[in-house]
């Protein structure tokens, strides 16, 4: 009877080891859950960035104002009969 209890205890310990430390065990589960959470956060951030880019594309396709604004800011273009003024901030060191 004592031998039977020892064998059952050994089998139980073997199963417990496999449950906690084996392939697809608890530690693998926790690691995978952390990776999933990290990927979900990254996907959320990328989804927000995609929405911003999609809105900008839609605005560039549909709106003339966005194209004019981009041309003015990036290339300093002006309309005919329009005067361009650049206001430079004065450095405190030059006083």
Swiss-Prot record:
The keyword Cell division applies. Residues 22-95 are periplasmic. The chain crosses the membrane at residues 4-21. It comes from the Bacteria. It is a single-pass type II membrane protein. Essential cell division protein. May link together the upstream cell division proteins, which are predominantly cytoplasmic, with the downstream cell division proteins, which are predominantly periplasmic. NCBIfam families: PRK00888.1 (NF002058). This is Cell division protein FtsB. The gene is ftsB.
């Amino acid at each position: 009877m004592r031998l039977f209890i020892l064998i059952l205890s050994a089998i139980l310990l073997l199963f417990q080891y496999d449950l906690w430390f084996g392939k697809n065990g608890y530690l693998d589960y926790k690691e995978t859950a952390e990776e999933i959470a990290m990927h979900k956060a990254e996907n959320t951030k990328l989804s927000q960035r995609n929405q911003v880019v999609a809105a900008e594309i839609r605005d560039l396709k549909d709106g003339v104002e966005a194209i004019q604004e981009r041309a003015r800011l990036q290339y300093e273009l002006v309309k005919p009969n329009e005067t361009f003024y650049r206001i430079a901030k004065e450095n405190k060191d030059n006083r």
